[in-house]
Regions:
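Domain-scale signature associated with acetyltransferase and cell-envelope carbohydrate enzymes
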Residues: 1-115, 120, 136, 154, ...
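Glycine-rich hexapeptide-repeat left-handed beta-helix
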Residues: 109, 116-130, 134-136, 142-186
């Protein structure tokens, strides 16, 4: 009986979330329809500040009120990894470039991923953006910054507090520092 009640409750939560969010983001391991998984809890918790109070109202997927996203249309990610948008203090700036987040990639709190910078000669202007690509199963440590044009290969680990200024497309490595450099291969 309890299992049936839980399924009915999840069904109503699903219908409620489908009204407010795009259905393509309500799938995957975070949104299991057999039990009340973390995705459903996070979507309900974010609904009021996001959709009623108006914080990031236009974004079609649930995000924490502590996350800043500039131009969500230029961000590509797996619906299994929606939890990256609940990591507090993260900043995703995709104004003049795209951000690709590979499947299984984890982004810790207070990370920044940016695709463009200001022009050094005229700070009111931005230079042309460059795409940022994070491979599959990467781990971006807390307080790290990924700068425009960076591409990280699969299974790259970025140490906490790192500033990644260049690409490490070979993957399977640990990088850290400011600027980030390869520490070791995995």
């Amino acid at each position: 009986m309890k299992r049936k009640i839980v399924r009915i409750f999840i069904y109503f939560v699903y219908l409620w979330c489908c009204i407010w969010y795009d259905k393509k983001y309500l799938v995957g391991e975070n949104f299991n329809r057999e039990h009340f998984s973390n995705g459903w809890k996070k979507a309900l918790r974010c609904w009021f500040p996001q959709k009623v109070l108006g914080y990031a109202r236009n974004i079609p997927f649930p995000i924490s009120k502590n996350v800043m996203i500039v131009n969500y249309n230029n961000i590509t990610f797996s619906s299994d990894d929606i939890s990256n948008f609940f990591s507090p203090g993260c900043f995703y700036q995709a104004t003049k470039g795209k951000i690709y987040i590979g499947h299984g990639t984890m982004i810790a709190p207070n990370c920044g991923i940016i695709t463009t910078n200001h022009d050094l000669n005229d700070l009111k202007k931005h230079v042309d953006g460059k795409d940022v690509k994070l491979g599959e199963n990467c781990w971006i440590g807390m307080n790290s910054i990924i700068l425009p044009g960076v591409e990280l290969g699969d299974k790259t680990i970025v140490g906490a507090g790192s500033v990644v200024t260049k690409s490490f497309i070979e993957g399977n490595c640990v990088i850290a520092g400011n600027p980030a450099r390869k520490i070791k291969d995995l």
